Amino acid sequence: METLQHLDNLRLSGKIRHIGLSNETAWGTSRWLTTARTHNLPQMVSIQNEYSLLCRLFDLDMAELSHHENIGLLSYSPLAAGLLSGKYADGTTPTGTRRSINADLGGRINEHLWPALNGYLDIAERH
């Protein structure tokens, strides 16, 4: 509640217009909304979570919550840390890329990735 009170003070002073969350779950978001409503504080209007063809966690429960609570998605990593750009096709790792620093790109690379990724890249190339 203290965080929401501080955010409300920032809103009332004109320093921010709205508030949102990042990397939050549906349960966590619903708790923020309940606290805001209970104490007449500003409600979250956006959620910034990862979302791409390879990361669809938002679709499991956040999409429903976002729809019913009018919370917009500000997706990040829409190209899945560069995987969907094709620069890592066939397992290559160009010098100076994220993958040259973090080999599995934060857990995105696993044995199931390459068949799906190659399928997406094939479709993209044909269209």
Predicted features along the sequence, with ranges:
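Beta/alpha (TIM)-barrel catalytic core signal, keyed to glycine-rich beta->alpha loops juxtaposed to Asp/Glu
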Residues: M1-H127
